[in-house]
């Protein structure tokens, strides 16, 4: 399948501390960016959620409190993430109900 892009598109996915968009926090952000000329780039950031990651959640994605203890917070990463996605269309699975509200 060939994409006919007029601007970049960023496919993104989040791993979190749980599924409550009002309470839970991001622990990992992955972005895969495709440019109209076909070039691609990807980046994954580990994020310190500043709250404990429940063991049942770690069992799903494998990210532990220890793994993110020395990572930047979302606030500290926000400008890097913005720079990667600005001027791009966004795409993700279930993103309208979970990832974007979070």
Q: Which residues make up each language-model segment?
A:
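Conserved non-catalytic scaffold segment of RNase H-like nuclease domains
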Residues: 1-102
């Amino acid at each position: 399948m060939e994409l006919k892009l007029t601007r970049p598109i960023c496919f993104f996915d989040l791993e979190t501390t749980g599924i409550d968009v009002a309470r839970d926090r991001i622990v990992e952000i992955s972005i895969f960016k495709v440019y109209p000329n076909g070039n691609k780039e990807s980046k994954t950031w580990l994020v310190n959620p500043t709250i404990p990651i429940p063991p049942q959640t770690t069992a799903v994605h494998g990210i532990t409190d220890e793994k993110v203890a020395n990572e930047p917070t979302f606030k500290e990463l926000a400008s890097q993430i913005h720079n990667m996605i600005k001027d791009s269309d966004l795409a993700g699975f279930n993103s309208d109900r979970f990832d974007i509200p979070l």
